[in-house]
């Protein structure tokens, strides 16, 4: 099986939905950055700004029953998995109404009913768990698959290769999505791994891999749909390396001095949100006024999330003793 781009193209409705989804993620993350600067959000906070086309496309090709797991840059993933933004923001602000009851914060978002299993703070630790989720699907013969996200830094973790081996050995239905945003914290891919084509990392286990442009929604949609079909039909893992870029630092505490302004601006010229907006207008899918209405609705959603979170109570002290295991 090879991914041959051009097989699938998003529908008019999917373009419009993706624009709204990506815009919501962008405005939500921008608001998170603002609230962090105001001291309303504490701890670590990793923003997804610039990478929205990746999760938007994956969400389009998911089927009901599929599961998702990712690392600590997880705000976008849980929102598109079906969690209302207000419950995500409440969690970031440490409120009892948050999706993890105010105890998980930015890096440990969960919504098990929606089959979103985190939000994991240890680099690469989610990969064996995602592999285990795929095992459950195979064991129960559900024909569901697990989308397991990891970053370019995680591919240097030993447990990732142990997971690859078991997934191939047992024929597990998992898509490993390597979100390669060029930097593992402040360390470039060129400085951290000899094999820079990360999609080839599973070759020794017989796992096929493909590289996609993560800044291009159309390519992401096409390639991701083919990848999901392959994994679902063959019950065998596959690796997608998506070349993407984060506009902000690794976290809110990172000034990102290890890269130039010119480099960042070069990627911003390929901003997926700008490109999909232009595509929609060029094809006359909707009017400028329609897009303005979408932008206003997104603004209201984010505003509601802020108001809800600010008016939500802090967790009761008794929560210190719940969900604690010895």
Swiss-Prot record:
Catalytic activity: N(6)-[(R)-lipoyl]-L-lysyl-[protein] + pyruvate + H(+) = N(6)-[(R)-S(8)-acetyldihydrolipoyl]-L-lysyl-[protein] + CO2
Pfam families in alphabetical order: E1_dh
SUPFAM superfamilies: Thiamin diphosphate-binding fold (THDP-binding)
Record EC number: 1.2.4.1
Protein known as: Pyruvate dehydrogenase E1 component subunit alpha
Keyword terms, alphabetized: Oxidoreductase, Pyruvate, Thiamine pyrophosphate
GO biological process, one term: pyruvate decarboxylation to acetyl-CoA
Cofactor: thiamine diphosphate
Function: The pyruvate dehydrogenase complex catalyzes the overall conversion of pyruvate to acetyl-CoA and CO(2). It contains multiple copies of three enzymatic components: pyruvate dehydrogenase (E1), dihydrolipoamide acetyltransferase (E2) and lipoamide dehydrogenase (E3).
Top-level enzyme category: oxidoreductase
Assembly with partners or alone: Heterodimer of an alpha and a beta chain.
Gene3D superfamilies in the cross-refs: 3.40.50.970
An MF annotation (GO) of this entry: pyruvate dehydrogenase (acetyl-transferring) activity
PANTHER family in alphabetical order: PYRUVATE DEHYDROGENASE E1 COMPONENT SUBUNIT ALPHA (PTHR11516:SF60), PYRUVATE DEHYDROGENASE E1 COMPONENT, ALPHA SUBUNIT BACTERIAL AND ORGANELLAR (PTHR11516)
Coiled-coil annotated spans: none
GO cellular component: intracellular membrane-bounded organelle
